[in-house]
Amino acid sequence: MHCPFCSATDTKVIDSRLVAEGHQVRRRRECTECHERFTTFEGAELVMPRVIKRDGSRQPFDEEKLQSGMLRAVEKRPVSMDEIEQALSKIKSTLRATGEREVPSEMVGNLMMEQLMNLDKVAYIRFASVYRAFEDVSEFGEAIAKLQK
């Protein structure tokens, strides 16, 4: 690792610790040339799969889009940001765990509905009505009946 102060190529690790629930390593380093100390963080680069849209096009996974969809669904509902972040994290973990380079958008939508069903039933119905393109009241009734089982 290059020293950020003098650009020397040789540094030594003084201390290493696991941080972020074991997902990162914090290292305290010292330059062997100028003796300045600095901290580095190392973590695995986790690549999200690409999303195959209904029309067959492919696009990179968009975390912002996922978050905005969930925020829209839970708007004015008693759901904390912490609960939202945990749900989004579960969706991303599940997508990574598939081991696939590409996943269908339906899978992302279904994972979103599954998390919303656990968070807030009204938010689930809101999202499902748009995602499934409900056309009449009977489709709402079917979705509500599914929740009551």
Swiss-Prot record:
Molecular-function annotations in GO: ATP binding; DNA binding; zinc ion binding
Residues annotated as domain ATP-cone: 49-139
GO BP terms: negative regulation of DNA-templated transcription
UniProt-listed PROSITE patterns: ATP_CONE (PS51161)
Signal peptide location: none
Protein purpose: Negatively regulates transcription of bacterial ribonucleotide reductase nrd genes and operons by binding to NrdR-boxes.
Keyword Membrane assigned: no
Protein name (record): Transcriptional repressor NrdR
Cofactor annotation remark: Binds 1 zinc ion.
Cofactors, names only: Zn(2+)
Pfam families: ATP-cone, Zn_ribbon_NrdR
Keyword line: ATP-binding, DNA-binding, Metal-binding, Nucleotide-binding, Repressor, Transcription, Transcription regulation, Zinc, Zinc-finger
